Amino acid sequence: MTTIVSVRRGNQVVIAGDGQVSLGNTVMKGNAKKVRRLYNNKVLAGFAGGTADAFTLFERFESKLEIHQGNLTRAAVELAKDWRTDRMLRKLEALLAVADETASFIITGNGDVVQPENDLIAIGSGGPFAQAAASALLDNTELSAEEIAEKALTIAGNICVFTNHNHTVEKIDY
């Protein structure tokens, strides 16, 4: 799996992820880019789960963003509807974390669209570790969203064998 973390603080939102691709217990690649900018660089998205599945979902999500003129909430809900009802999409195993300057969501294969309550998302095998670290840093430091995301990923990578220290970080300042 992997670890993807999204942190929102002040006028900044960040999605960051590690670069490890595993097949069973074997590391296949260490520098994968699991975080991307979409819709004219106005939306951030990261994935955890099957790589091929995630690319399919990125394409579908970007298409929904285009159709709904960058409206993140509407695009997320419409992708989740498709994911839940389309026979091919239902077989895809991945989670998406998406964010823009106004909102952040987790989109699941069950058709759920979840908005976090503390401006924090963490998904993937190292997600619980990253979430705990980021939550503590949000509550007890003045670090930026980017610094918190980096530190949370580093902590997750120290604990989770399916997460490495090769990070991709994308941010939007607004």
UniProtKB/Swiss-Prot annotation:
The name this protein goes by in its record: ATP-dependent protease subunit HslV
Gene name in the database record: hslV
- Give the protein family: Belongs to the peptidase T1B family. HslV subfamily.
Q: What class of enzyme is it?
A: hydrolase
Question: Which catalytic residues are annotated?
Answer: T2
HAMAP family attached here? Answer: HslV (MF_00248)
Which branch of life, at top level?
Answer: Bacteria
The record lists Na(+) as bound by: G157, C160, T163
GO MF annotations, alphabetized:
metal ion binding; threonine-type endopeptidase activity
Q: What is its EC number?
A: 3.4.25.2
Per its database record, what is this protein's job? Protease subunit of a proteasome-like degradation complex believed to be a general protein degrading machinery.
| Pfam families reported for this sequence | Proteasome
- From which source organism is this entry? Pseudoalteromonas atlantica (strain T6c / ATCC BAA-1087)
**GO terms classed as biological process:** proteolysis involved in protein catabolic process
